[in-house]
Curated annotation (Swiss-Prot):
The keyword Mitochondrion is assigned to this record: no
Keyword Ion transport: no
Membrane topology: Multi-pass membrane protein
Species in which this protein is naturally found: Mycolicibacterium smegmatis (strain ATCC 700084 / mc(2)155)
Main location class: membrane
Location of this chain's protein in the cell: Cell membrane
Gene giving rise to this polypeptide: aftC
Name of the protein in its database record: Alpha-(1->3)-arabinofuranosyltransferase
GO molecular function, one term: hexosyltransferase activity
UniProt similarity note: Belongs to the glycosyltransferase 87 family.
Protein purpose: Involved in the biosynthesis of the arabinogalactan (AG) region of the mycolylarabinogalactan-peptidoglycan (mAGP) complex, an essential component of the mycobacterial cell wall. Catalyzes the addition of an arabinofuranosyl (Araf) residue from the sugar donor beta-D-arabinofuranosyl-1-monophosphoryldecaprenol (DPA) on the C-3 of an alpha-(1->5)-linked Araf from the arabinan backbone of AG.
Mutant phenotype after disruption: Cells lacking this gene result in colonies with a more erose appearance compared with the usual glossy appearance. The mutant yields arabinogalactan (AG) with a significant reduction in arabinofuranosyl (Araf) content concomitant with a relative increase in the amount of galactanfuranosyl (Galf). It shows only a slightly reduced growth rate.
Pathway info: Cell wall biogenesis; cell wall polysaccharide biosynthesis
Enzyme Commission code: 2.4.2.47
């Protein structure tokens, strides 16, 4: 044991000294990029978690969670929120309360810091698993680039600053994808368990259950529904007021609020759009999403399962954020697996309109204008909505134009990718 520790210490010392020694040959581009990106990525993770996360913000998503688990421990009412104010509310079902109950046995600050730590760890594990899904390793340039890109986004930063659970949600989604791609009964059951744990807390990833149905991976549904069912059955007699969740909280969840809501209906109500126009917009974007999903299913499900699964997930989640009653900016965290498809040669994201859309729902830039406050508020409040909307337009247009070209060339039976893409199915090594 002692020899192993000495060897490890010597190895670390040697690596540190080698970083400052003159090179005997010109470093590769990948080596230079890794040297640049890793320090920035690591410090960005530390800054977002240790500095911004612990400093917190006026928006505190953890406060209601902590009050709920403390009330659960003490046997007090949990689902007694006053929904007539705009502060964060506790909306998790009894099963989610049971899952998070251990945080109620720590002092509030310690509990919050552990909550942040678990989410940071979940983000990092999810990043590693995404690299493996796309055949990259930690020694590639893609590793620090992905970590840096994730922790520079509004969605990850606000997840940690507001102390939300989206890091664990992302990890659940990535595990779900990884096991679905692996295939087999055991992997399908594990995929269902992974997404089922997220459904115990909130239903944000529920639209993804369409994917195993379309791919005939029905074992996934057993654990996807079984895990939240078991947690809620176990929690029901332990929660003092479980029916208040049904009578009081569920109607609020199903309603539409006109603040901190980037969905079409949320921003539409905020800006006073007529309901017929809101409905028309929702129908238009629903049709775009359905068209994209059909093209993906018809031409990619069997030819390119990875591309089909992850691109379809992006369409499903983006459409749900945009079309359902509530869409918040940090929900975009769950889109990282979809955005990683940019490394694939047939990605729908290799064009500038796609990255204009991504800027809209991922940027930390604030567009509030001191001299023109009305214009500034509009730009700030609508950038996420426009980003999600443009993304659905981009995906449909890319796939539809591929379809038209393939139909014109008479090669629909070979798929809709341009012929040159057939020679570049795998991402280039980085």
């Amino acid at each position: 044991m002692y020899c192993a520790l000495v060897t490890a210490t010597d190895s670390i010392t040697t690596k540190l000294l080698n970083a400052f020694r003159p090179r005997t040959s010109a470093p590769s581009t990948a080596t230079v990029l890794r040297s640049v990106l890793w320090p920035i990525a690591i410090l960005s993770v530390i800054h977002r978690s240790y500095v911004l996360g612990t400093n917190g913000y006026i928006t505190d998503d953890f406060g209601p969670v902590y009050r709920a688990v403390i009330n659960f421990k003490l046997g007090l009412d949990i689902y007694n929120e006053q929904f007539d104010h705009v502060d964060p509310h506790y909306l998790y079902p009894p099963g989610g309360t049971l899952l998070l109950a251990p945080f109620g046995y720590l002092p509030v600050d310690a509990s919050r810091y552990w909550y942040i730590s678990f989410n940071v760890l979940a983000f990092l594990i999810a990043a590693y698993l995404m690299l493996r899904i796309f055949d990259y390793t930690l020694s590639s340039v893609a590793a620090p680039a992905l970590v840096l890109a994730m922790f520079c986004t509004e969605s990850v930063t606000n997840t940690l600053v507001f102390t939300n659970i989206n890091g664990c949600m992302l990890l659940g989604a990535v595990l779900f994808f990884r096991w679905l791609l692996k295939g087999g009964r055991n992997a399908e059951l594990l995929a269902g368990a992974a997404i089922g744990l997220t459904l115990v807390v909130k239903p944000s990833l529920a639209p993804l259950l369409l994917l195993p149905v379309l791919n005939r991976q029905f074992y996934t549904l057993i654990t996807a529904f079984g895990v939240p069912l078991v947690f809620n059955i176990a929690a029901w007699p332990l929660v003092p007021d479980p029916m208040n969740f049904v009578r009081h909280t569920v109607p609020y969840i199903m309603s539409t609020r006109d603040y901190f809501n980037s969905s079409i209906v949320g921003n539409g109500i905020y800006y006073g759009l007529p309901m017929w126009l809101i409905l028309l917009l929702r129908v238009v974007f629903l049709l775009l999403a359905v068209g994209s999903l059909w093209l993906l299913y018809r031409y990619y499900r069997e030819r390119d399962p990875r591309f089909w699964l992850l691109t379809s997930s992006g369409v499903l989640l983006t459409a749900s954020f945009l079309l359902l009653s509530l869409g918040q900016g940090y929900y975009s965290t769950m889109l990282f697996p979809f955005l990683m498809t940019v490394v694939l040669p047939n990605s729908v994201l290799r064009n500038w309109p796609a990255w204009l859309a991504i800027y809209g729902f991922m940027t930390m830039d604030r567009w509030l204008l001191g001299h023109w406050p009305t214009t500034g508020r509009f730009l700030e409040y609508m950038k996420i909505t426009y980003g999600w909307s443009l993304m659905l337009v981009v995906v449909f247009c890319v796939l539809y134009f591929r379809y038209l070209d393939a139909k014109q060339d008479g090669r629909l039976d070979q798929g809709i990718d341009p012929p040159w893409m057939a020679r570049e199915r795998t991402p280039a090594p980085v």
